[in-house]
């Protein structure tokens, strides 16, 4: 016999469902979203949620890791690179807070910089490259945005200590320096240094000379580029190996790639020219030559979906491609688009007298590579990209795939950086949608359960909490959330790409006139 359900029974069920749903709805609208969120529209709503995510994640760091250079949110603990800390996390994140208008957080960070920060520590050597792009760059952009001389004073003190690393026969910097003793004692293996590290310090040094009127930083930057562009064995190809000998100035080996140890060298070829108001410098010529080399030697496509990718040449120009691409390479779509248009809208750029087949080619390639970089996210179980992907050239696997050892995600910024640049220049809403999908995936899988903390993942193919890696990188605050926030900024007069150039750590510098009369390259 079938039991009959009365009206009273159904009413009780509806009431129970209502009682269950109301608290969930309340939590979703008041806890997960910022106040007033429902009154906002479109991009403004999304920008507000990204800002709220920054506040929550930063508050977790302030609570459990304040002042530490590294932060491990699962164990709620931090670690310093030097005994008293370097301000790694705080200074790297400072200009993001300024851009988002987080006055209270900026004030607390400033108090730490004023009262606790000292470079006079001699217990360990630090990376010249990382310290330059994150801390020197962060201080300089924070000074520009606030006009607070504290940051400029700290920048001068830091840069003077970093200059000790450039005391080599070529002027190329050693990899590490002791900020306290102003010496480099760690022997670099056979004096080999990374091409990217040597070629990604110039924007910061030149801007500091511009601000202070002291030419020594600008001269130091020029000397490094004289060496990096001066090896005749490679200069005609536009592509260079990922290692250089700081004693002889010659490139070492034949390994060419746009991933680790190569990436930002090519990025700064363009950005050094943009920083000087696209004045037709030798750096622009070198960048254009490098793009030609990338297209001739590194560019390839999958079958049948025609995903563009930038391969590696571990054996040099005369050897076979390795169909492998680091997430780091996803800086390239934005760089190509920026280089083709000089930061103006694509519509306006196409009416310029300087527009031609080269610029159209670079725009097309930027859009193709952007599609590939987004697919690196779209193809995974979590919607987040692995650190490295491979491309199937034998048509035996998926067109884009990752190996287990490369499936970790560090919440890197390169893809959202390029999405921001492509949206600003093309106004194509697809780039906002892709960026939003990536942000939502961070919310779902990088957030710690029951916490407003975010951490890296061990595997983007696992949705399990146990596969969360205990580390919040400073570039989560300095770059990833900043670029996502700016992606949904409707006012393009804020940090316009025609007047600002972002360093490789997303610190915005205003473009400058070369009034130093030091342009020696």
Swiss-Prot record:
> Which GO MF term does the entry hold, naming one?
mannosyl-oligosaccharide 1,2-alpha-mannosidase activity
Q: What are the TM regions of this chain, as residue ranges?
A: 9-31
Name the Enzyme Commission number(s) assigned to this protein: 3.2.1.113
User: Do you know which SUPFAM superfamilies this protein is assigned to?
Assistant: Seven-hairpin glycosidases
Cystine residue pairs: 330-373
Tell me the compartments it is located in. Answer: Membrane
Q: Which reaction does it catalyse?
A: N(4)-(alpha-D-Man-(1->2)-alpha-D-Man-(1->2)-alpha-D-Man-(1->3)-[alpha-D-Man-(1->2)-alpha-D-Man-(1->3)-[alpha-D-Man-(1->2)-alpha-D-Man-(1->6)]-alpha-D-Man-(1->6)]-beta-D-Man-(1->4)-beta-D-GlcNAc-(1->4)-beta-D-GlcNAc)-L-asparaginyl-[protein] (N-glucan mannose isomer 9A1,2,3B1,2,3) + 4 H2O = N(4)-(alpha-D-Man-(1->3)-[alpha-D-Man-(1->3)-[alpha-D-Man-(1->6)]-alpha-D-Man-(1->6)]-beta-D-Man-(1->4)-beta-D-GlcNAc-(1->4)-beta-D-GlcNAc)-L-asparaginyl-[protein] (N-glucan mannose isomer 5A1,2) + 4 beta-D-mannose; N(4)-(alpha-D-Man-(1->2)-alpha-D-Man-(1->2)-alpha-D-Man-(1->3)-[alpha-D-Man-(1->3)-[alpha-D-Man-(1->2)-alpha-D-Man-(1->6)]-alpha-D-Man-(1->6)]-beta-D-Man-(1->4)-beta-D-GlcNAc-(1->4)-beta-D-GlcNAc)-L-asparaginyl-[protein] (N-glucan mannose isomer 8A1,2,3B1,3) + 3 H2O = N(4)-(alpha-D-Man-(1->3)-[alpha-D-Man-(1->3)-[alpha-D-Man-(1->6)]-alpha-D-Man-(1->6)]-beta-D-Man-(1->4)-beta-D-GlcNAc-(1->4)-beta-D-GlcNAc)-L-asparaginyl-[protein] (N-glucan mannose isomer 5A1,2) + 3 beta-D-mannose
Q: What are the recorded Gene Ontology BP terms?
A: carbohydrate metabolic process; ERAD pathway; protein glycosylation; ubiquitin-dependent glycoprotein ERAD pathway
Cytoplasmic topological domain: 1-8
**Membrane topology, record value:** Single-pass type II membrane protein
Regulation of its activity: Inhibited by kifunensine.
Q: In which pathway does it act?
A: Protein modification; protein glycosylation
Q: Which residues bind Ca(2+)?
A: 504
Its predominant location is membrane
The protein's role, per its UniProt record: Involved in glycoprotein quality control as it is important for the targeting of misfolded glycoproteins for degradation. It trims a single alpha-1,2-linked mannose residue from Man(9)GlcNAc(2) to produce Man(8)GlcNAc(2) with low efficiency.
Return the PANTHER family for the record: ENDOPLASMIC RETICULUM MANNOSYL-OLIGOSACCHARIDE 1,2-ALPHA-MANNOSIDASE (PTHR11742:SF55), MANNOSYL-OLIGOSACCHARIDE ALPHA-1,2-MANNOSIDASE-RELATED (PTHR11742)
Tell me the protein's name. Answer: Endoplasmic reticulum mannosyl-oligosaccharide 1,2-alpha-mannosidase
Species, as recorded: Schizosaccharomyces pombe (strain 972 / ATCC 24843)
């Amino acid at each position: 016999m079938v039991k009959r359900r009365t009206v009273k029974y159904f009413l009780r069920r509806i009431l129970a469902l209502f009682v269950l749903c109301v608290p969930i709805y309340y939590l979703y609208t008041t806890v997960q979203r910022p106040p007033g969120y429902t009154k906002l529209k479109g991009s403004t709503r999304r920008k507000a949620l990204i800002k709220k995510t920054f506040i929550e994640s930063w508050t977790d760091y302030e609570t459990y890791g304040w002042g530490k250079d590294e932060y491990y949110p699962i164990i709620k603990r931090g670690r310093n690179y030097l005994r008293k800390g370097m301000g790694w996390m705080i200074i790297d994140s400072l200009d993001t807070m300024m851009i988002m208008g987080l006055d209270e957080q900026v004030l607390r960070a400033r108090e730490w910089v004023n009262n606790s920060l000292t470079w006079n520590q001699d217990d360990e050597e630090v990376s010249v490259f990382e310290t330059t792009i994150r801390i020197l760059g962060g201080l300089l952009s924070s000074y520009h945005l606030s006009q607070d001389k504290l940051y400029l004073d700290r920048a001068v003190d830091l840069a003077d200590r970093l200059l000790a690393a450039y005391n080599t026969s070529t002027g190329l910097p050693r990899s590490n320096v002791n900020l306290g003793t102003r010496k480099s004692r760690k022997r670099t293996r056979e004096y080999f240094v990374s091409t990217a590290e040597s070629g990604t310090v110039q924007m910061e040094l030149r801007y500091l000379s511009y601000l202070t009127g002291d030419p020594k930083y600008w001269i130091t930057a020029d000397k490094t580029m004289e060496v990096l562009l001066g090896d005749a064995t490679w200069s005609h190809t536009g592509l260079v190996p990922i290692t250089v000998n700081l004693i002889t100035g010659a490139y070492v080996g034949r390994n060419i790639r746009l991933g680790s140890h190569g990436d930002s060298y090519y990025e700064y070829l363009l950005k050094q020219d943009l920083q000087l108001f696209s004045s037709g410098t030798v750096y622009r010529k070198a960048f254009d030559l490098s793009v030609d080399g990338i297209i001739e030697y590194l560019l390839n496509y999958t079958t049948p979906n025609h995903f563009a990718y930038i391969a590696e040449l571990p054996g040099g120009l005369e050897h076979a491609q390795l169909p492998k691409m680091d997430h780091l390479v996803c800086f390239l779509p934005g760089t190509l688009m920026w280089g083709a248009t000089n930061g103006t809208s694509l519509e306006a750029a196409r009416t310029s007298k300087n527009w031609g087949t080269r610029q159209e080619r670079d725009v097309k390639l930027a859009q193709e590579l952007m599609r590939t970089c987004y697919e690196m996210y779209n193809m995974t179980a979590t919607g987040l990209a692995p650190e490295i992907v491979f491309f199937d050239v034998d048509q035996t696997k998926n067109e884009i795939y990752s190996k287990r050892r490369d499936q970790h995600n560090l919440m890197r910024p390169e893809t959202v950086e390029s999405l921001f640049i492509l949206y600003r220049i093309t106004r194509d809403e697809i780039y906002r949608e892709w960026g939003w999908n990536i942000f939502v995936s961070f919310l779902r899988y990088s957030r710690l359960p029951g916490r407003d903390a975010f951490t890296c993942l061990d595997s983007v193919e696992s949705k399990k909490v146990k596969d969360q890696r205990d580390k919040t990188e400073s570039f989560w605050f300095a770059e990833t959330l900043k670029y996502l926030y700016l992606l949904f900024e409707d006012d393009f007069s804020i940090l316009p790409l025609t007047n600002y150039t972002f360093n490789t750590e997303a610190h915005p510098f205003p473009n400058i006139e070369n009034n130093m009369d030091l342009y020696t390259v």
